[in-house]
Amino acid sequence: MLILGIETSCDETSIAIYEHADNNKSKILHSVVSSQINLHSSFGGVVPEIASRNHIIKLESLLLQVLNKSEKSINDIDLIGVTNRPGLIGALFTGVAFAKALGYALKKPVLGINHLLGHTLSAELIYENLFPPYYSLIISGGHTHLFFVDNCYNFTLIAKTVDDALGEAFDKVSKMLNLGYPGGPIIEKLAQQGNEKAILLPIGMKNSPNFSFSGLKTHIKLLIDKNIYKAEDIAASFQFTAALTLYKKIMLNKKKYNINKLIISGGVAANNYIKHYLTTGLKDVQLFIPPARLCTDNAEMIAYAAHRLFGRRDFMDLSESAYDKLSVNFY
């Protein structure tokens, strides 16, 4: 079975083909991601209209590229999986419209995939013996959410951010330091030159199982205004506090839930410092963290998620749309 994955939830356009085989040789045949960082960096963040228009420009050429590299024809595709929630609504529309048009023309089924489900299942692409039940922590520019995933891939929300997502906090701190966008890799690189213990920063809602990063962000703004600390020390202290916050929240939730298997995914999971901090600190938790290319937005995870959900046969019809909110059910 050949599954086409399409991802356009934010500012990356991605296409992938996943081949499912019964002989344990299932694999991604080819995947491509077209980043829009150069289009948005001067604005200090993603401009939804620009993102949507660029998806429209890129989708067809990326599809042809993936088919060519996979040595497959469009008629070989058996199933189409497309991100349809949550995300930037205009960006989502472009991918969903493209997928539905392909499905209609080829007479092939289309599955709408929750972006957060894709992030979680990206770990299964790497760890062959990883199966639910497990817990999933998604840390990205739009989400900081902890879920329990049962053996039927039903998600139960355990904890979440009550304000800023962690990736959003990275972007805003970078912007306050006049370092540019996206903030994640910029802060990580600058922090290597700083002292992570130079500044004692607060952990938001430290006694709550939920996450909060707005207070941390505000505290850093006040420090920057005082102009008494070096940027690299601010970056290092912020990154340390972000990692410490994740660790403490996981341990706090572990008191109530049996968090013995934990997937950590999403764009912030590509941060090597945070990855090392949690891997070192959470010694009694089995961690599964995908490589960086699968932490950021990609179509590989969407194609694989479509494979996992195929048995539900909950296919999209032409009247179905995209949804920008997480409150929509996972399936």
PLM features per residue range, with description:
Residues 3-9, 16-21, 30-31, 130-132, ...:
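A short helix-loop
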Residues 91, 259-278:
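Glycine-rich phosphate-binding loops at beta-strand->alpha-helix junctions
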Residues 2-86, 115, 119:
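N-terminal beta-alpha supersecondary unit
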Residues 112-134, 304-305:
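Conserved phosphate-binding catalytic cores of ATP/NTP-utilizing and phosphoryl-transfer enzymes
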